Amino acid sequence: MPVCLLVSEDNSHKPIELHHQQSVTLGRGPDTKIKDKKCSREQVELRADCNRGFVTVKQLGVNPTLVDDVVVGKGNQVSIKPGQSLYMVNQQYPYSVKFTEDTSRSKPSKRAQQIQSPTKTTADVSDSPPPPKKTTPPAGEKSESAGHWSQGLKASMQDPKMQVYKDDSVVVIKDKYPKARYHWLVLPWQSISSLKALRSEHVELLKHMQRVADQMVEQCPDAHKLSFRLGYHAIPSMSHVHLHVISQDFDSPCLKNKKHWNSFTTDYFVESQDVISMLEHDGKVQVKEGAGELLKLPLRCHVCGKEQTTIPKLKDHLKTHLPS
């Protein structure tokens, strides 16, 4: 049976061996050489499926663990395969996984806090990729990345009921949980996981995405009385690059918490033109360090800057700025 190795991409330590269906808890400590106190001592739980060639990553720590710039989220889990990158915390300390038939050549380090996998409960089966030939995935579960919600865009962009525009390069869909009266997503058909994966060769594609977004705004029946912004989340919650086209009324029942609000009204929301400019000048997109902390900022009105203590109070205040 193949053996899985967790490999530090910055070569800070020897590969860590992950045995088949055995849980390994990792974080700050001697095994990873991580000393950053923002990384919990028990930041992630990893479980390798050596037969099927993936590793399940469950975030245990408070600060974000990412897979290809997609936040896992505390208590959530996703799958990682060879070719993807796992960032232990806050887009730092990158790892990849490797499956090999003979571990004697690699001499991996001692496994950290390894625990023999207990018998799966019903909850375990619903939350993680099923073991081979034993459990049927729950109804409606998607095969890619164990059907995790972060992969939902890839299904939505193929759904004719969700599409409002498409051409050979892009598709526009309605956001499933709109945070304003008008909220669309422009997605390329080309598979691009995140802002971090963008390069200078993608400039023309992103310019086309922006032109399509501008057309959506121009065709909106309320464009004469509502303002719009076009941009990307610094650390997206969904896999696959997508450009938000969102009206600035934020009049929606789906806007429910501080993270929702701050993701569209702080520097966490990166303007489309700024992303294009970074690619033209630097050949890549630089996400500011600590961008995730912006989601914790106080609630402030995006129009007048007045601070509000709760989402309901913020929504009441926003009504004073709505066009008549």
Swiss-Prot record:
Instruction: Point to the regions of Polar residues compositional bias.
Output: 111-125
Q: What GO biological process terms are annotated to this protein in UniProt?
A: single strand break repair
First and last residues of each zinc finger (C2H2-type)? 299-321
* UniProt subcellular location: Nucleus, Nucleoplasm; Nucleus, Nucleolus
Q: What is its main location?
A: nucleus
Among PROSITE patterns, the record links this protein to: HIT_1, HIT_2, ZINC_FINGER_C2H2_2
- In short, the EC number is 3.6.1.71, 3.6.1.72
Spell out the residue ranges making up region: Disordered: 100-160
Q: Report the superkingdom from the record.
A: Eukaryota
Q: Where is this motif: Histidine triad motif?
A: 240-244
* Domain FHA-like: from-to ranges: 23-72
The record's GO CC annotations read:
nucleolus; nucleoplasm; nucleus
Q: Does the keyword Nucleotide-binding apply?
A: no
Per its record, how is this protein called by name?
A: Aprataxin
Gene name in the database record = aptx
